[in-house]
């Protein structure tokens, strides 16, 4: 008993030292990983259906994509916190973040971030030239520039929409060495989806952002947020419809992904209170998990329909 009790303080101390690093990577806030992963999963499943990709190959690539999404999300959060630390100290929701609070130094954060990036580069090292190029762009310039956009434009979400959704064309490029028109159309919808959910997310901090000088579509759209977001919702559903037609998707996709996804967005936009931070967070969390899953479920059912349910089971 004496040995066990003597180890408890050191265990607690080790855990407390790890907490800032865990907080820095946002591994406990999985919604950010999912909004990176879903576009890749959508693109891959569309490609798998078109190519009749073997289930084992599909599953392996999907798992790698999920792991890469976890790493890229964490690296992006670290970089964002390094650049935004002065802003974060002025916003109630973010002032306790590890870099803003001084729990982690800039040097330590940079080393940690580059460790993530080196693993990501290793994962795409043997891919074809197009997938390699898209992967490098997805890892470095696109997410790297995003935090700066909040300083110079009220449309940072538009840039974020490009940065977070390259997974669609990446999935096609990795499996086929090219990307079809359907993947571009779906990417437009995913871009609109990012503006949709990140505008809702930004509504949590509207008052603090005004004081800190942070720009966002939540401030730009003002009292017209819901009408504007309904327009972006229409773009999302329209792109799902058109990309499905171009990719020769069948009934399961149109019923679940297009119909179910559209119903989810409409219901969510009707219910969310954009002046209540908790309601905004719940809506963001819902679209990050539920909308993405609904769209993927339709794609997965259609893939099973194409290759034969027996192959999936």
Swiss-Prot record:
It is a multi-pass membrane protein. The keyword Ribonucleoprotein does not apply. A motif (DxxxD) lies at residues 205-209. Keywords: Membrane, Transferase, Transmembrane, Transmembrane helix. Its main location: membrane. It holds the Pfam family UbiA. GO terms for molecular function: 4-hydroxybenzoate polyprenyltransferase activity. One of its GO terms (cellular component) is mitochondrial inner membrane. Pathway: Secondary metabolite biosynthesis; terpenoid biosynthesis. The chain crosses the membrane at residues 30-52, 57-79, 99-121, 131-148, 155-177, 227-247, 250-270, 293-313. Mg(2+) binds at residues 84, 88, 205, 209. HAMAP family: UbiA. The conserved residue His-73 is the gatekeeper residue for hydroquinone (HYQ) substrate preference. Contains the three motifs NDxxDxxxD, DxxxD, and YxxxK, which are highly conserved in other UbiA prenyltransferases. Motifs NDxxDxxxD and DxxxD are involved in the binding to Mg(2+), whereas motif YxxxK plays a pivotal role in GPP stabilization. This is UbiA prenyltransferase claS. It comes from Ampulloclitocybe clavipes (Club foot). The lineage of its organism: Eukaryota, Fungi, Dikarya, Basidiomycota, Agaricomycotina. The gene is claS.
């Amino acid at each position: 008993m004496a040995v066990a009790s003597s180890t408890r303080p050191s265990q607690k101390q080790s855990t407390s030292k790890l907490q800032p690093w865990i907080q820095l990577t946002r591994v406990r806030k999985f919604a950010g990983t999912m909004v990176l992963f879903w576009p890749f999963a959508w693109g891959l499943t569309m490609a798998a259906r078109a190519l009749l990709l073997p289930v084992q190959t599909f599953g392996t690539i999907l798992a790698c994509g999920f792991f890469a999404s976890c790493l890229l999300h964490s690296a992006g959060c670290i970089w964002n916190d390094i650049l935004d630390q002065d802003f974060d100290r002025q916003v109630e929701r973010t002032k306790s973040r590890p870099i803003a609070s001084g729990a982690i130094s800039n040097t330590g954060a940079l080393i940690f971030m580059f460790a993530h990036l080196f693993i990501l580069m290793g994962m795409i090292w043997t891919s074809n030239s197009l997938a390699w190029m898209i992967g490098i762009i997805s890892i470095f310039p696109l997410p790297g520039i995003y935090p700066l956009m909040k300083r110079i434009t009220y449309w940072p979400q538009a840039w974020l929409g490009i940065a977070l959704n390259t997974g669609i064309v990446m999935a096609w490029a990795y499996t086929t060495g090219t990307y079809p028109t359907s993947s571009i159309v779906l990417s437009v919808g995913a871009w609109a989806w990012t503006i949709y959910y990140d505008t809702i997310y930004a509504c949590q901090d509207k008052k603090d952002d005004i004081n800190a000088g942070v720009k966002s579509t939540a401030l730009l759209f003002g009292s017209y947020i819901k009408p504007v977001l309904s327009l972006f919702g229409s773009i999302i559903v329209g792109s799902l419809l058109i990309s499905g037609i171009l990719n020769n998707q069948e009934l399961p996709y149109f019923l679940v992904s297009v119909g179910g996804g559209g119903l989810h967005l409409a219901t969510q936009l009707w219910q969310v209170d954009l002046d209540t931070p908790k309601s905004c967070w719940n809506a963001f969390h819902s679209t990050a998990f539920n909308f993405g899953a609904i769209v993927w479920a339709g794609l997965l059912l259609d893939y099973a329909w194409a290759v034969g349910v027996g192959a999936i089971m």
